[in-house]
Amino acid sequence: MKQTITEKIFSEHVGKKVSAGQIVESNIDMVIGNDITTPISIKAFKESGAKKLANPNGFAIVMDHYIPAKDIMSANQAKISRDFAYEHDLPNFFDEKDMGIEHALMPEKGLVAPGDVIIGADSHTCTHGAIGAFSTGMGSTDLAYAMITGKNWFKVPPTIKVEFIGKPADHIYGKDLILEVIRMIGVDGALYKALEFTGDAMAYLDMDSRFSLCNMAIEAGGKSGIIAVDDITKEFLSKVNLRSEPKLHYSDEGANYDQIITIDVSKLEPVIAYPYLPSNGKSVSQAVKDDIKIDQAFIGSCTNGRLSDLRIAAQILKGKRVAKHTRLIITPATQKIALQAQKEGLMDIFVEAGAVVSNPTCGACLGGYMGILGAGERCISTTNRNFVGRMGDRTSEVYLANSAVAAASAIAGKIVDPRDI
């Protein structure tokens, strides 16, 4: 039986050959919680009568949504996770002392590895598929079950193969590729399916772009996004202290795919997702014609807050100023990224351009804090969702784009093509 990479990963974890559609109970390599979702898991864990974690080294709590605490309620919620982490002497607990957005911090720390089965109580846990792992989001009670047993049940997902061919033009990144996929198949086009990204264009995508690709698989309804390990992955992994030995899997030639999609990336312009769905994608040329004024630009999140995003933004912002009636907020995804950006002089460029640089946080993306939109305000954002009220008031609008578009638009005060700056 020919297998996809996803079927092979599950087969190894279950101990027998499995195929799409089968219900299996799988061992879990890494369980990830955050300050918002983990307290519910902890409550379920305690109510079960459990006294210890099945695999303390395979459980991480990353405090990233409202950290540092934005108010009393978030402070009390954070305290639940802190107390639990200290009580169980959790080795992988990350708060203000070593903070970052979970889906950037976990790969940076080497806590996720190729061939792993990873779950997290956050829908964008699919990000980690970029290193050749099966990674997906689950509910907090599902997380509690894995905390107690080290396992969870799955229906092995069928796979949609996405082949990217050609060489991307200037300022075309993983964000544009995934927005194009979502535009083509819709927000439910990959419902409970693995999106496997392949093709010769992958050779032009660095790991940051690959994380962006897999991060937004969920926005097409995907159970996961996954990219097989290649030389680019291996170079990235060589620079981190991996928690476990990587297990490399590759789809068999002739494996069964639910669908195969081919996209010629050489023909792509930067893609902008208009309100109020990530599938509402249009070309940057169309956005320029539409003359869309903006009140805020945001560069950050688990989708596009990595070092390459900051470098791209700095290259565009250097020697320029943010438009008078526009504000620019930049949120590095981890402290390590922020430190490297500082060493490279990027922070100076941002501040001199009139941007605000925040600590690592998910805050603005979910309309929590550090960039909330007011009534009728419009934002160009590198985040992953633009639903009604996603970043603030229900009458506000969010346009999703890559970091180059966001930076260039901040200077112009309206959505522009970064290739014209």
Segments the model singles out, each with a brief description of its role:
Residues 1-421:
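Fe-S-dependent hydro-lyases/dehydratases of central metabolism
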